[in-house]
Amino acid sequence: MAELDTIYETKIKYTGLFSFNDLYNLLYDFLTDYNYFVTEEGYTEKVRAEGKEIEVKWLCLKKVTDYFRYRIKITMRLFRLLEVEITKEGKKVKMNKGDLEIKFTAILERDYENKFEISPFHKFLRAVYEKYIIKNRIEQMEDKLVEETLTFVNNTKAYLELEAKK
């Protein structure tokens, strides 16, 4: 079985005006621009008296080498989501108002093709390979994964800050 190491985890919280559709598309486009394959693992929507509750779960995979793969899990949770109409630059625009929470979990997946799972001896070889031969390479992969995840997080924050200023 592939080795999964959670490298980085963070959460963004935001309350105010934003466009959920724009945010959804922005994140999706950004991930695909970085060559991630995005799978929506879940989407639930509940209508409550105070507004909608939505939860979206994505699994984003990026093959880096034959041995390493980046895995980013994103969970978007929205509470008290209401559709409101605002006037922006003299035009009426539909926006969303509510609470938003986005969780990013970056995971480095090693031996995702299970090439070292053939026998106990191969598993031992993988341990030696990782500990002595590619130790620095693993650290580089971890750093690059954190860097990419932070890019997604910072761009999401920048979008939300822009929406707040409008």
Where on the chain are the PLM-derived regions?
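Solvent-exposed residues in well-ordered beta-strands and their adjoining turns
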Residues: 13-19, 59-61, 77-79, 103-109, ...
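Detector for Asparagine
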Residues: 21, 25, 35, 96, ...
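Glycine-rich, aromatic-bearing surface loops/beta-hairpins
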Residues: 103-166
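Intrinsic-disorder/low-complexity, polar/charged segments enriched in Ser/Thr/Lys/Arg/Asp/Glu/Gln
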Residues: 7-11, 53, 99
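Short, well-structured alpha-helical interface segments that form or flank functional binding sites
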Residues: 18, 22-25, 51-53, 147, ...
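Generic, low-specificity signal for short hydrophobic/alpha-helical stretches with a mild N-terminal bias
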Residues: 5, 9, 38, 56, ...
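Terminal, regulation- and interaction-focused segments at domain boundaries
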Residues: 1-39, 44-46, 140-141
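Hydrophobic-cavity lipid-handling domains and compact docking modules
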Residues: 32-96, 104
